């Protein structure tokens, strides 16, 4: 039986010809039998691909041969090509869609003017040091708000955003101005959203901004469920969520009966299909697999 794996990585680096990189990446993945999603822009690459482990290793090795991708931090997880419906390789204005391509500055070293990178151990050191001085680090979730329903850092601020496009409006709303003089640690799944988010926050006057290097994925690999993270990690493929150990808490609640769950399901109304948390019992019936307050659609 073949051993399969999924890799997640990104790299911010100037790309003179994004379309040429797109063609190369598509040809490489097709040759190796990989599926997944790859986004390329003038500012870099954002990729999640899966397949047979030998093919994935060859893909990573070949991708790193591109000048700007030598130092990409690759995160490995269980899964394979079957977790993605197809291979998608696209060129876009941004490799993560905040709707602010003009605000981001990228050079050979990555994003210019973003937050200070902290490895998981360094994050703990910062939290402890501030605690000793009577201060506290504010955790700021850089994901879509619904993702935090099943997992987040303890006492984290979770902005009211449906997509990353909503972050600029949210930051400009004034809701978080009281945090501008506090140490703020941004976090997201693999680190890419915080590369941009931390830069946007610095641009808006947040004085001490950090970003979790490698994101929740790297933190979970380091501390499992013995650190400051609680719950499951939402992922954008057929797996839907993953846990870092058997000791993971289930913090999500079914919208119908409040039973603990980490499983998102689409509303059974064909014109709605909103992704919502349901327990197995409520998800088993079309009558209960519906938005309890009525569908917005």
From Swiss-Prot:
EC number of the protein: 1.14.-.-
One Gene Ontology term of the molecular function aspect: oxidoreductase activity, acting on paired donors, with incorporation or reduction of molecular oxygen
Active-site positions on this chain: 188 (cysteine persulfide intermediate)
Key words of the record: Oxidoreductase, tRNA processing
SMART domains: RHOD (SM00450)
Domain of life: Bacteria
Catalyses which reaction(s): uridine(34) in tRNA + AH2 + O2 = 5-hydroxyuridine(34) in tRNA + A + H2O
CDD domains linked: RHOD_YceA (cd01518)
Annotated NCBIfam families: PRK00142.1-2
Designated name of the protein: tRNA uridine(34) hydroxylase
Gene (UniProt): trhO
